[in-house]
Amino acid sequence: MKMNLHCFANLIPIMILALFSNSGLINATEVGKRTDALEASAWNESKWISAVDAPVVKGHNNGRAADGASWFVSTVKNEQKIVSAKWMTAGLGVYELYVNGKPVGGEFLKPGFTHYAKTKRSFTYDITDIIRTKPNAENMLSVQVTPGWWGDKIITPGGYDGMIGKKCAFRGVLELTFSDGSKRRYGTDLKNWKAGIAGPVKHAGIFDGEEYDAREPMGYECVDKLSTPEENTEFSGDILPSDGAEVYLRTDLALAPVKAYVWKNVEGAKENEFGKVIIAREFASGTEMTVSPGETLVVDFGQNCASVPSFVFKAAEGTVLTCLPAELLNDGNGAKIRGMDGPEGSCHRENLRIPHTGIR
């Protein structure tokens, strides 16, 4: 089975995220504008909610976050014509917002790292330009939350029973201003929201990487699979307005690959050396890359960087593409005495905290 890739690597210099591909920059489309938070008392009109079926990590072997992504969906019907809409949000876990199926905000890995018990950061958006404003029109709010910053290893010490954060959760308040000047708020609750484990993200964690099944619909496309949420009482600290995320999309900083090649066999292997990869094919930037079973594609950006890869590929149903980012390539004929973990020209992974996980 062959797999054709329009291969791309997406880069994130520290604190800055850039997405790119071999065929050019990947344009992320988001809506909504960051705005000032509502007054703190507005949180009283909402609850932290979680999916009843969300798995919980148990036991002292807690190296991997719980599988699945929690989705939260609610539909709001306009009582009158809307002239303004603001959505104040917070999450226990990394969360992504959608209004009528469109992603809201340009931040990545919201809400960022804070003390797990004391503080969570909120993000408020003016979504007036993207909602349906006519009387009786309906708008769908949806959120995906995964365990990062909450229910994963990054905040959980070794030997701990399970993870510090048990279930992902979401909390939000939508404020609508009507044409007659009146306002109404809609907070997360157990009556008007649906929740469940759904969507294409099958696993995600700060150290774990992400497993993504593109055959699966987004959570807002399968609301019939969701059910009544439960209240989450794990966090009792303060929710404070954010002054900006730690990671933003910066297409102006995107890097192009300096080299890309496929290898399969090895030459020059010795007792204390892994040898050197035999390059089967090299690819110019912007060209289609074909990878056959047993082959490994190496996309080299020529420098170490924090990155988020993006892939456009074509293959038969059931094909699994595994992406294993690395900080460096093995060299020196794969000399074991130098700490190499494979043949020269292959990706070196043993220096990473979790070397055998990545994106699938």
Where are these regions (language model features)?
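Bacterial Sec-dependent signal peptides at the C-terminal "C-region" and cleavage site
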Residues: 19-33
